[in-house]
Amino acid sequence: MNAQWGTFRRKGSVHDLLVEAEDAMRGQGYQVANPVSNNNSMVMGGNDSVLAQATATSTGPEETYLIVSAFSQDASTAEQARNTVRDGIKDLYNL
């Protein structure tokens, strides 16, 4: 099993940023097993080749700390999934 992960901060609420992560997963055709509507801190989805997860917590007014992880038998597949989900999460507010 190969794992890829990264941490970063974005401007926006936990909920709104996780919705962006979920949208990025759905955009890749992933089945979302734990949608944002079922929880308030994590979204998870994947397919037969990869599992991706985005976890978030608030670090201040309109700022969120995120961890995006992906797991696959193939390191390249895990890396691509992590990057795709991460890149789908944009700053929602200008500083």
Label each region the model flagged.
Residues 33-50:
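A cross-family detector of function-defining hotspots
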Residues 26-38, 91, 95:
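Short secondary-structure junctions
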Residues 1-32:
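Terminal, regulation- and interaction-focused segments at domain boundaries
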Residues 4, 10, 43-44, 58:
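Intrinsically disordered, low-complexity segments enriched in small/polar residues
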